[in-house]
Structures are given as structure tokens and as C-alpha cells.
């Protein structure tokens, strides 16, 4: 409410989208406190990724121009496509709204694939060696690719392969959301502190560990359930054996 009041007083229409995202996050948080379910957590991740889609535009412009400057192309200017930014945020918002309303799985699946395609379109603007030579650009690209892969898996899961649903959600929550928050905060922190834009070793290690954790959790989601079920079955067998032995 305070942020919305400041935006209204400053008459800055460019921040209205962030106010909407903050409102949605607050709504999801209140709903989860009243009814803690996995579906609400999934909507919170989707809304956070909408915020990522909006913030990425400014972050991408900063790292793109820095990459050109570091590569000796300071006369060039990098400007991300604002239309793909808006389209990706709108389609993801539509998917989150449709999923919250309990639409049929095929509808959600096609919208998830549309979301993946919209974010994949944003990757095209980075397909230049002048940009990809910079390590922070490669990190940004890798996390964005994880987001595309996550919604692709989610769409496939909701169109008929439900075994991919849990891996997709783990990939989105860890390798997309958490990793992108790390990238954005590290880049924004250096820029606002007046420091040179560098991809420090500790940040690289943190990002690598998050990506590895997300991918391993994605690949091992079903395996972990099988191991858990096996352990539970073995415990039950042991209890039955000892009960028969004692009595």
C-alpha cells in the first residue's frame, strides 16, 4: 500500500506493473496463510517469475551495454525488445490466472507452452558473440534457459505426461526463480553501489550450486518418491516380521 501511494504521488506510470505484481504476491501470501496448499505456492512462483520478466528488461539492458563496452564496442547500444518483455509477462499472468481458476489441464498445458515460447523469444536478442563473451550475460542466459525448460516441461506434463509436473515445478522454483533473484540482486547491487560490473567467483559458485541443486532436484523428484516408498515398505515389513516373531 505504501509503495502504491508513493507511485501515485510521483505519477510514475512505469511502475504500475510492479504495483500489480506486489498486490498479487500479497494476495497469494494471505491466501497461503489461510489455506496452505501447494497450488497457492505454485501461483506465488508464477507471480515471482512475472516480476522477473519485468525486471529483466532493465537488468538486461545494463549487462548488454556493459558487455559491449567491455568488448570494445562502446559505440554500440543494446536495447532489449520491450514487446517480447510485455508478451512474456502477459502470457505468464494469463497462465497463472487460468490455473488459479481451476481451468482444464489441456488449457493450462497449452498456456504453459505459450509461456515457454514467449520467454524463448526473449533469448534471441542475446544470440551474439559480442554479448555472450561476458560471463554475466552467459549466467543470465543460462537461468533464462532454465525458465524456458521449466515451462516447457510443465506444459508437457499438463498435456498428458503428469510425471513431469513435479520436476518442472522444482526446476522453476529453484533453477529459475531463486537463481534469477541471485543474478538480478548481484547485478543491481553492483550497479547501484557504483562498482564495476563483474561476475565474482563467490557469485559464480553460488549460482552454479543453485542450478545444480535445481537440476538434481528436477531429475530426482520421482526417484526420491520411489526411494521413500521403498523405505516405508521395508519399515512396514520389518514391523510385521517383529510382530509375528513376538506373538
Regions found by a protein language model. Give the residues of each.
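Hydrophobic alpha-helical transmembrane segments of multi-pass integral membrane proteins
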Residues: 1-247
Amino acid at each position: 500500500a505504501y509503495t502504491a501511494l508513493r507511485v501515485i504521488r510521483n505519477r510514475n506510470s512505469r511502475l504500475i506493473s510492479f504495483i500489480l505484481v506486489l498486490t498479487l504476491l500479497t494476495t497469494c501470501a494471505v491466501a497461503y496463510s489461510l489455506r496452505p496448499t501447494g497450488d497457492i505456492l505454485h501461483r506465488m512462483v508464477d507471480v515471482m517469475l512475472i516480476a522477473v520478466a519485468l525486471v529483466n528488461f532493465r537488468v538486461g539492458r545494463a549487462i548488454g551495454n556493459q558487455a559491449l563496452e567491455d568488448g570494445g564496442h562502446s559505440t554500440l547500444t543494446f536495447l532489449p525488445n520491450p514487446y517480447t518483455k510485455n508478451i512474456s509477462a502477459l502470457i505468464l499472468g494469463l497462465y497463472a490466472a487460468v490455473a488459479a481458476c481451476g481451468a482444464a489441464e489441456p488449457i493450462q498445458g497449452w498456456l504453459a507452452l505459450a509461456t515457454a515460447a514467449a520467454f524463448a523469444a526473449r533469448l534471441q536478442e542475446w544470440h551474439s558473440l559480442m554479448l555472450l563473451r561476458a560471463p554475466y550475460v552467459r549466467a543470465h542466459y543460462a537461468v533464462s534457459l532454465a525458465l524456458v525448460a521449466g515451462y516447457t516441461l510443465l506444459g508437457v506434463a499438463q498435456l498428458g505426461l503428469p510425471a513431469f509436473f513435479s520436476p518442472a515445478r522444482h526446476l522453476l522454483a529453484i533453477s529459475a526463480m531463486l537463481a534469477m533473484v541471485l543474478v538480478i540482486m548481484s547485478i543491481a547491487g553492483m550497479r547501484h553501489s557504483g562498482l564495476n560490473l563483474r561476475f565474482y567467483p563467490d557469485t559464480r559458485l553460488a549460482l552454479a550450486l543453485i542450478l545444480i541443486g535445481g537440476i538434481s532436484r528436477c531429475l530426482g523428484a520421482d526417484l526420491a518418491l520411489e526411494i521413500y516408498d521403498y523405505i516405508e515398505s521395508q519399515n512396514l515389513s520389518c514391523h510385521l516380521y517383529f510382530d509375528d516373531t513376538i506373538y
